[in-house]
Amino acid sequence: MKISCLKVGGRTIKTVVAVFLCLMTGIIRKSDTAFYAAIAAMLCIQRTAEDSLREAFNRELATVIGGAFGIMVMVFEKNVYRIPCEIVRYFLLSVLLIPIIKFSVLIKREKGTFLMCVVFLCITVTHGNDEEPFLFGFARIVDTTIGIVVALVINQFPIGRGIKPPYKE
């Protein structure tokens, strides 16, 4: 009876290498947000270089737009008015998804709507109490850009049909 192991394909290997490199950039940069670079890299490693480039463009644009909306809200809250009631704040943050969604439709980038909203909420919900929310928003955009660049570079390397681990008989 043969028990074959799972085949590890080229795209899987590229993804692992890209994630590792992104996490290493976090060590080099002394950043605790390299996780976002790794996510971007995973999303941008696609079957072909063309598909990767398309995904990278969509990802970068969505991150910049969601990040810009998030940074605007955080700067407003820090400098003008911070809603003291958490329930009301969360309600308003949810309502603020409407202009983000409408903007994505306006610029005909509906495919990036989900990511725009995720980045916006990531900045406004998880970092609402940061001393410098602008820095996190900016770091979030930089990390995504790093992940995209790493993925695009890694995806240029041709990797064969995969590595097949030995199987038992």
Regions found by a protein language model. Give the residues of each.
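Alpha-helical transmembrane segments and their membrane-interface boundaries
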Residues: 1-169
